[in-house]
Amino acid sequence: MELEQLKCFVAAAEELHFGRAAQKMGILPASLGRHLRLLEESLGTRLMSRTTRSVALTEDGVALLEEVRPLLHRLQTLAEEFRSRKTQQATVLRIGAIDSAAAGLIPPLLHDFRERFPGIITQLVEDKSIRLIPKLIAGRLDIVFIRPRDGLNRNLVVRTLTQETPVIALPVTHPLANRERISVDELREEPLIVPERRSRPHSYDLTMKLFEDAGLHPRIAQTADEKQTIINLVAAGIGSAIVPRWTAKLAVFGVTFVPLMTVGGISLRKLPLAAAWAKAVRDPGRDQLLELLDTNIDRYAEQA
């Protein structure tokens, strides 16, 4: 017994005419007749009495119709539900981002992406670069926004997007707090709050390099990893901190943010932000995000 045989039987039972039933099924009358004969053989009973003028259901045919018709209707409903579910199943794009990207570039990017591609669900994971990269390599993320570094996995594509502007976070009571710009040379005696290098190598190295280029040694007063914690420590008067410009959005009471200059008076812009993804993986959603990013990078970079 096959599903197609049961469908042919129900069509013939409803039409009581082989020609119309065959047309309804989209097959030839001879094919319809063959399906019915095979069904009767498998059940070992006559389901229809047929003459050249009429078709009628036998008692067994009536009993079978009562059982089969609701079953076929339910199967049809289930098939439609399955097809609809598959059609509506959204693509998921898994995005990893360091705090700088999550606070600056990502919000306007995701706003535009969701408007342009409403059928793609975006999942955002915020973490440090050293944790995001292994997740990308393992296939748990589709694209990450990180601080690029030398020696990344050769199976990754890494594209630098922008250079974030570092500023100095100072307590509002600090003598330099009202300045429009501050030279690194003016921070020679300033107690600094820096992240641990093992967790945030780019941020740590940036501070070290700025002082090294100025021929100075930084005075490290405290280490802390999270930007919110660092800014809170600045507010408490523990010290000052060189941080990305976006941290001003944290709006912690008692802290001001002043642009930095090198000793020669040139404004700084030395915190690279990059996108990375798996070289061998094809992902239309990721590629659409990258295309949108390429088109609007100047506007998004303003938030960095």
UniProtKB/Swiss-Prot annotation:
Gene3D superfamilies listed in its UniProt record = Periplasmic binding protein-like II, Winged helix-like DNA-binding domain superfamily/Winged helix DNA-binding domain
**GO CC terms in record:** protein-DNA complex
Record keywords:
DNA-binding, Plasmid, Transcription, Transcription regulation
Please report the stretch or stretches of sequence annotated as the HTH lysR-type domain.
Answer: 1-58
GO MF terms, alphabetically ordered: DNA binding; DNA-binding transcription factor activity
Q: Which CDD domains match?
A: PBP2_LTTR_aromatics_like (cd08414)
What the entry lists under Pfam families is as follows: HTH_1, LysR_substrate
Query: Which InterPro entries does the annotation name?
Result: LysR_subst-bd, Tscrpt_reg_HTH_LysR, WH-like_DNA-bd_sf, WH_DNA-bd_sf
**Chain residues forming the annotated DNA-binding region:** 18-37
* PANTHER family assigned: HCA OPERON TRANSCRIPTIONAL ACTIVATOR HCAR, TRANSCRIPTIONAL DUAL REGULATOR HCAR-RELATED
UniProt lists the family membership as follows: Belongs to the LysR transcriptional regulatory family.
- What's the protein name? HTH-type transcriptional regulator TtuA
Encoding gene, per UniProt annotation = ttuA
